[in-house]
Amino acid sequence: MIDEALFEAEEKMEKAVTVAKDDLGSIRTGRANPGMFNRIGIDYYGAFTPITQLASINVPEARLVVVKPYEASQLNAIETAIRNSDLGVNPSNDGNLIRISVPQLTEERRRELVKQAKSKGEDAKVSVRNVRRKAMDELSRIQKDGEAGEDEVGRAEKELDKTTARYVAQVDELVKHKEAELLEV
């Protein structure tokens, strides 16, 4: 019972870190990166579909992204979605593919993006801590129901604290790397 609670908590913490990694990856840096487009999508036959599933996205140069839709009919919709996104880029459509020149970030914009990265990191740490709290409640319930002794639950709580600290440190490291990447000129 205790092992199941710890395993489930660790699994959920891992998911929180994965979501944080994806969120941080969607924040654009000064370089072109296909991950910038992970959160952009269009209405495709009645369903919201990410453009990463509707087009090939290549980075031939450090500041250039080329988006080639699998269906030519989706070209304008994809271009509009990119233009309306919060990426701050201006796509150009040549009839077959979309070229996106990624401009250099201003110092002010870099600072805003660092704040955004820290905010997303903090959200991830809150998620990890919420998982810990729920697992602690579960351990208390196990002890109260007499399914495990006080010593076993105490050891499990210490193990849970170590696991929580490890995942919080992973999130901190992700944010630190993203911050360094954003501030690099």
From Swiss-Prot:
One GO molecular-function entry: ribosomal large subunit binding
Statement: the UniProt record of this protein carries the keyword Hydrolase: no
A cellular component term, taken from the record's GO annotations: cytoplasm
Record SUPFAM superfamilies: Ribosome recycling factor, RRF (SSF55194)
Biological process (GO), any one: translational termination
Record keywords: Cytoplasm, Protein biosynthesis
Residue numbers spanned by region Disordered: 140-161
Record Pfam families: RRF
InterPro entries: Ribosome_recyc_fac, Ribosome_recyc_fac_dom, RRF_sf
The keyword Cytoplasm is annotated on this UniProt entry: yes
Subcellular location(s) per record: Cytoplasm
Family listed: Belongs to the RRF family.
Function description: Responsible for the release of ribosomes from messenger RNA at the termination of protein biosynthesis. May increase the efficiency of translation by recycling ribosomes from one round of translation to another.
PANTHER family: MITOCHONDRIAL RIBOSOME RECYCLING FACTOR PSEUDO 1, RIBOSOME RECYCLING FACTOR
Protein name: Ribosome-recycling factor
Species for this entry: Rhodococcus opacus (strain B4)
Taxonomic lineage: Bacteria, Bacillati, Actinomycetota, Actinomycetes, Mycobacteriales
Gene it is expressed from: frr
